[in-house]
């Protein structure tokens, strides 16, 4: 199931690599309600974050992954600056 929310990017993390070799980059995202949200981009989805800067307003589409421990289980599918 995919979810879509709108909010403000407050920080873009560094690219890291999991023990299995997957590239991961985390985003700090403040929803319109004021709640903080910390989704992760995996693998080639990291390219979606290259143009994003703190303060940008964006629409984020994501899904929840059952795998926990290696990375945040909220996975970015698409992100578009609005």
Language-model segments: which ranges?
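Single-stranded nucleic acid-binding surfaces, predominantly the OB-fold ssDNA-binding core
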Residues: 1-82
